[in-house]
Amino acid sequence: MRKYLAEFLGTFMLVFLGTATVVIAKGDVLAIGLAFGLAITVSAYAFGGISGGHFNPAVTTAMLINRRIDAADAIGYIIAQIIGAIVASAAVKSFVSALGLSATLLGQTDFPKIGSGMAFFVEALVTFLFLMVILNVTSNDHGNADFAGLTIGVTLAFLIIVALNLTGGSLNPARSIGPAIFAGGSALSHLWVYILAPEVGAILAAFCARVMGSED
């Protein structure tokens, strides 16, 4: 139960701090990227020692494929992550209402400037790169646990900065599910991209990490 609570709290912190910054930063790409990067770094150091610090169903999928977590825990982690994201988005909605902002501004992800195919590719690619860093930096053989949280946070920040104006830079199904439930509209109808594409990227990264010897 402690592990699931850690995943809930870590995901809550990531989604709440990240999407709240999206709301108040008004398109400031650097601020948004740094917010998500710092949030996951803090969450990793605060809760990673308890659960491993996934905070993302795509990360859990990769860890399951590479046998770093069993199926029962993987299911529990993903449920905790999604619930954490939904509760975080509910908190952001209250935050938005208190500020008198539009109720549709919840930090949701969407891709109004590109097609669904390109959006899928972008999300799969950035998630693949993100997972390659995670799987290698946390490797028992050649990882560096002392700097893992910082490395992962910096990587997430840069990848979100790159992808933000294309897809919103999700890299995380839970991060998109939470806001989409409350925002509705195209954020909800396009949610399949933000669920499937990161999972594809994670699966590819898991197998690539095996080839590189990260899972020996």
From Swiss-Prot:
Q: What is its main location?
A: membrane
Q: Look up keyword Cell membrane and say if it applies.
A: yes
* A family per Pfam: MIP
Q: Where is this motif: NPA 1?
A: 56-58
Give the residue spans that cross the bilayer.
5-25, 30-50, 72-92, 114-134, 147-167, 191-213
Which Gene Ontology terms of cellular component type are present? plasma membrane
Give the InterPro entries listed for this entry. Answer: Aquaporin-like, Aquaporin_transptr, MIP
Q: State the similarity comment.
A: Belongs to the MIP/aquaporin (TC 1.A.8) family.
Q: Highest lineage ranks of the organism?
A: Bacteria, Bacillati, Bacillota, Bacilli, Lactobacillales
**Which SUPFAM superfamilies does UniProt cross-reference here?**
Aquaporin-like (SSF81338)
Q: The motif NPA 2: which residues?
A: 172-174
Q: What is the role of this chain?
A: Probable transporter that facilitates the transmembrane diffusion of an unknown substrate. Is not permeable to water, dihydroxyacetone, glycerol, urea, H(2)O(2) and D/L-lactic acid.
Q: Note the superkingdom of the native organism.
A: Bacteria
Q: Where in the cell is it found?
A: Cell membrane
The name this protein carries in UniProt is Glycerol uptake facilitator protein-like 6
Name of the gene: glpF6
UniProt keyword annotations, A-Z: Cell membrane, Membrane, Transmembrane, Transmembrane helix, Transport
User: One MF term from GO for this chain?
Assistant: water channel activity
What range does the record give for the signal peptide?
none
- Provide the topology term for how it sits in the membrane: Multi-pass membrane protein
Question: Which species does the entry assign this protein to?
Answer: Lactiplantibacillus plantarum (strain ATCC BAA-793 / NCIMB 8826 / WCFS1)
PANTHER family for this protein = AQUAPORIN TRANSPORTER, MIP17260P
